[in-house]
A protein has these predicted regions:
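Hydrophobic alpha-helical membrane segments
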Residues: 1-345
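Phosphate-group recognition and catalysis centered on beta-loop-alpha active-site segments
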Residues: 295-594
């Protein structure tokens, strides 16, 4: 029999190898966690020696101004290479030994993976690492490092991209280009790790393989994903049958109906978790198998054992269902005590009134108040003659059709402009001053004043503090900024004035940054970060979740405030959250896990 006739591309043999895959993942992730933990501790100590507690998106100059900076960059690259070794290389090496029927020794695999790093110490290797770290997660390519698997384009950037058709098309074109780069280089790592090719030769080899076999490769991709879908459906069918039986038996028993709902939700959660954790390993085995075929390499290549696989499936099914039944019974018995919660998350209107009124205007503040928002966030900049006006952009081009910047104009000149929000073309306004906004907000809503633009400096802090004190509103305002040095200045000189630091990227002891509030970008707000911030008696704001699902997600966490454009939707979501049905409570909790 020819070697290629031995090859099977069904998902069944992969399921048979699942116990070994799970054991390998457990050990590889544990080893990787330990190594990275050591690097994080050393990196944190290096940051502390600079007199700071963290590096963030608004305070990263130490990377090029101190001797610790280059060391931190080297350690960051070292972390990426470690992830490359123990996150992806181990999977390919493991898959090759599994396919060849060799005895799998974890120590040998980890040793080989660690020393494989040397093959990437060149420009081509660095390019591969950076692609898998930064680009693959964003474009959705199947291979990526778990370190950055949730990497995203920050909302404040993506909103700009999607608001302009040309930006959107350019981004789409880039995504397609990078996807094709990933596709044509899908076998590059296999060439490096299995055939011991240098990076550039492995690239050429992978592209040659795809050009010759692209139809067969795409067909096998389809079969792989089809089989995954079939097992998803099979699992769901079994669960649905059990649910129908339960519903028929306990149709008039609300307590048992809730048990069934819990069981469905937990089963789906486990299915998603297990599939997600094992998917890349299965995918690597499939791709490695194809590499053996296309390169004419011999091996045992996972022969099918359908009887064993059949019993394996039902054993795994029972292994998951029994604990899920017991957990569902426990949660159902203590449902209110464990699962039901109310929220008092405060809603903050972005740019005065969010999408409910022209941005950064008095009408915006009035709209935020009318919808029951806790706060209103505004952006201030200084004029040429020293006054403070409310405007987000670097100039007035978007809203006033004037390309001049606030610092280039006097207050009188700015007051002659007509502000027309594209979302409210029939509702022209005048550019508001800080004082006008303060008067509208006093004793009605908390103002979050962002120190914005080129004029955001210590003078701005001093002037704004003076103004809000004169208005007797020091306890009704929070000064916020993306510039950490300004927030540190507020805390140092005006400790009784509340301050908030906004950041979308941070490393180190972020919670110890000198501020009263920390504002984190949507996807950067994690449960562990929330707990750490609260442990230091600080408050946390998340910006800017506009989709209802994301707002509902954060209502189910311990964040203090949500900054959003969709204020009406968010305040209604708070009310709905506090009046949820049992099934809504269950679905919200399951959603929050992911």
């Amino acid at each position: 029999m020819k070697p290629k006739e031995k090859l099977s591309y069904s998902i069944l043999p992969y399921l048979q190898a699942t116990p070994d895959i799970m054991k390998y993942q457990l050990f590889s992730k544990a080893l990787l966690w330990l190594l990275v933990w050591v690097i994080r501790q050393i990196s944190t100590l290096l940051i502390l020696t600079t007199g700071r507690v963290a590096i963030s998106s608004g305070d990263y100059d130490l990377l090029y101004k101190t001797w610790q900076g280059p060391l931190l960059i080297i350690m960051a690259l070292g972390t990426l290479f470690l992830y490359m070794a123990f996150d992806i290389n181990t999977q390919i090496i493991y898959a090759s030994k599994l396919l060849e029927g060799k005895q799998i020794k974890m120590v040998e695999i980890f040793k080989e993976s660690f020393f494989s790093i040397r093959q990437f110490f060149n420009p081509g290797g660095l390019g591969i690492v950076l692609y898998l770290t930064l680009i693959a997660p964003i474009v959705g390519f199947s291979f990526s490092l778990s370190l950055t698997s949730n990497l995203y384009i920050p909302t404040f950037i993506s909103s700009v991209i999607y608001s302009n058709i040309y930006y959107r098309l350019f981004f789409l074109a880039l995504t397609i280009i990078f996807l094709f780069i990933g596709l044509f280089n899908i076998f590059t790592l296999h060439g490096i790790l299995i055939s011991k090719m240098p990076c550039n030769k492995a690239d050429d080899n992978s592209r040659a393989i795809i050009k010759k076999n692209w139809k067969h490769y795409l067909k096998q991709e389809f079969i792989f994903f089809r089989d995954i879908a079939i097992y998803y459906i099979l699992f769901v069918v079994v669960v649905v049958i059990l649910v129908i039986i339960g519903a028929v038996i306990w149709i008039d028993n609300d307590h048992m109906i809730r048990f069934v709902e819990l069981f469905i939700a937990l089963t789906c959660a486990v299915l998603v978790t297990v599939t997600t954790s094992l998917f890349q390993s299965y995918y690597v085995i499939m791709v490695t198998k194809l590499y053996y075929r296309y390169m004419g390499l011999l091996g045992a290549l996972l022969p099918d054992e359908k009887r064993k696989v059949k019993w394996f499936f039902f054993r795994r099914l029972a292994m998951y269902i029994i604990p899920l039944v017991l957990l569902s019974l426990l949660l159902n018995t203590y449902f209110d005590e464990i699962l039901v919660k109310k929220t008092n998350v405060g809603i903050i209107a972005h740019r005065a009134g969010g999408a409910e009124a022209p941005e950064n205007t008095v009408k915006g503040v009035e709209a935020a108040i009318s919808y029951g928002a806790y706060g209103s966030e505004i952006d201030i900049q200084r004029t040429a003659d020293g006054y403070y006006i409310v405007n987000h952009d670097v100039n007035f081009a978007r809203l006033c059709s004037d390309k001049r910047k606030p610092e280039e104009m006097t207050l009188d000149e700015i007051k002659e402009l007509t502000l027309t929000d594209p979302n409210f073309p029939d509702d022209p306004e005048k550019v508001a001053t800080l004082e006008e906004i303060l008067d509208a907000a006093k004793d009605r809503i908390v103002l979050f004043i962002e120190l914005k633009g080129n004029t955001a400096d210590e003078q701005m802090v001093d002037d704004v503090v003076k103004i809000i004190k004169e208005k007797d509103m020091a306890d009704q305002c929070v000064l916020i900024s993306l510039k950490y040095n300004l927030i540190d200045y507020v805390e140092s000189k005006y400790p009784k004035i509340d301050s908030a630091y906004l950041t979308f990227l941070s490393f180190g002891k972020t919670a110890q940054l000198n501020c009263d509030y920390l504002g984190l970008e949507d996807e950067a707000t994690t449960t562990s970060m929330i707990k750490t911030i609260h442990s230091l008696d600080k408050k946390i704001m998340v910006w800017t979740p506009n989709e209802k699902k994301r707002q509902e997600y954060f209502l189910n966490t311990e964040v203090d405030y949500i900054i959003t454009d969709n204020v009406k939707q968010a305040t209604e979501a708070v009310e709905e959250f506090n009046n949820r049905s049992d099934i809504e409570v269950i679905s919200d909790i399951i959603y929050s896990l992911f």
